[in-house]
């Protein structure tokens, strides 16, 4: 069977050259006579893999020296707990900006550890926009402020990162890390599950300023303490070695594409193809505030559930798969991460045009 265009929100499409290299090296990595999946994480071979992955991420994101890159497990969802356990150490209070389902889940976990202040929310607008933050991030006595830079389910993103001068800014970048340029120095902590733009499921990346490490409560479990990973080069226990290896290959691929600035321009072009059609369409609509449209996750719908289902079925027959929207939003959603080629988006738009002509 030919490969399809996979618009899944995660686990998501990986670059074909990466998959082909994985296939080539699967049973015999670098002449070792064994697979990465069989290799000791204490071996020099794996040490070079994790070091290269860290160095590539530092290079691609221009990460300052005062930050650690940590390779973790448990997904972004475990970070919802790790963050307050490690950072709620002075005021026992944190600020959260609610912009979607995932930011709400992050807040709910933080409430189990300390006090949470909702700084701003777009929930009344059904998370179709990003709330204004002007003047809301002042001299509050907070241990950190948490945002979600891209809302995978709702299809919104921050256009400008809020300025927080006296409080560490924590960002969930799971669905748009490496898709556009960010100034890492504006953040105290960035985290992301790998399964959208970095690699396969099983790996979580954390980029954390070192002065935020070491403040966890003494009751914090060892495996939930950032210091454990920082002191042990993310090798305190067996890491998700295969996921780290594939992520390294994805980072190499991204560098070959010209880095983050080049992929950002391509992502803008891909998303514009779809948004331009949606803006002109008489059948399909997008629920998102145009100012805050995501480059990565694009929800859209037709006037009826019957048409939505027909669209999805015929799309699948054309090799355009995993377009069903999240159950909380409905309709369709096209996730067009870094690895999605321009021709994949163009084929989707071409099909949408044909479907509209058939259903005038």
From Swiss-Prot:
L-glutamate binds at residue 42. It comes from Bacillus cereus (strain ZK / E33L). Keywords: Amino-acid biosynthesis, Aminotransferase, Cytoplasm, Pyridoxal phosphate, Serine biosynthesis, Transferase. CDD domains: PSAT_like. Catalyzes the reversible conversion of 3-phosphohydroxypyruvate to phosphoserine and of 3-hydroxy-2-oxo-4-phosphonooxybutanoate to phosphohydroxythreonine. NCBIfam families: PRK05355.1 (NF003764), serC_1 (TIGR01364). This is Phosphoserine aminotransferase. Pathway: Amino-acid biosynthesis; L-serine biosynthesis; L-serine from 3-phospho-D-glycerate: step 2/3. InterPro entries: Aminotrans_V_dom, Aminotrans_V_PyrdxlP_BS, Pser_aminoTfrase, PyrdxlP-dep_Trfase, PyrdxlP-dep_Trfase_major, PyrdxlP-dep_Trfase_small. Pyridoxal 5'-phosphate binds at residues 76-77, 102, 152, 172, 195, 237-238.
């Amino acid at each position: 069977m030919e490969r399809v265009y996979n618009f899944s929100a995660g686990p998501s499409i990986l670059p074909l050259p990466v998959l082909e290299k994985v296939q080539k090296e699967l049973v015999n990595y670098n002449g070792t006579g064994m697979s990465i999946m069989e290799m000791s994480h204490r071996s020099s071979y794996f040490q070079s893999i994790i070091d290269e992955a860290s160095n590539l991420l530092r290079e691609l994101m221009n990460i300052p020296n005062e930050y650690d890159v940590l390779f973790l497990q448990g997904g972004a969802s475990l970070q919802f707990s790790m963050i307050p356990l490690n950072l709620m150490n002075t005021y026992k209070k944190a600020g959260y900006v609610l912009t979607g389902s995932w930011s709400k889940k992050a807040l709910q976990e933080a409430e189990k550890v300390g006090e949470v202040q909702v700084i701003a929310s777009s929930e009344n607008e059904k998370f179709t926009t990003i709330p204004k933050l002007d003047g809301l991030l002042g001299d509050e006595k907070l241990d950190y402020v948490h945002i979600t830079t891209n809302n995978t389910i709702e299809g919104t993103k921050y256009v400008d990162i809020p300025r927080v001068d006296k409080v560490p800014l924590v960002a969930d970048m799971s669905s748009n890390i490496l898709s556009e340029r960010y100034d890492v120095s504006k953040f105290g902590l960035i985290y992301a599950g790998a399964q959208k733009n970095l690699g396969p499921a099983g790996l979580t990346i954390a980029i954390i300023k070192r002065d935020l490490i070491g403040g966890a409560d003494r009751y914090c479990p060892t495996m939930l303490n950032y210091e454990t990973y920082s002191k042990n080069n993310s090798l305190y226990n067996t890491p998700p070695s295969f996921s780290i290896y594939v992520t390294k290959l994805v980072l190499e691929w991204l560098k070959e594409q010209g880095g983050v600035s080049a992929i950002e321009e391509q992502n803008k072009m891909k998303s514009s193809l779809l948004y331009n059609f949606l803006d002109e369409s008489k059948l399909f609509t997008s629920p998102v505030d145009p100012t805050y449209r995501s480059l990565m996750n694009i929800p859209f719908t037709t006037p009826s559930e019957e048409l939505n289902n027909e669209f999805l079925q015929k799309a699948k027959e054309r090799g355009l798969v995993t377009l069903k929207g999240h159950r909380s939003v409905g309709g369709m959603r096209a996730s067009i991460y870094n690895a999605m080629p321009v021709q994949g988006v163009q084929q989707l738009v071409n099909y949408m045009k044909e479907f509209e002509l058939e259903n005038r």
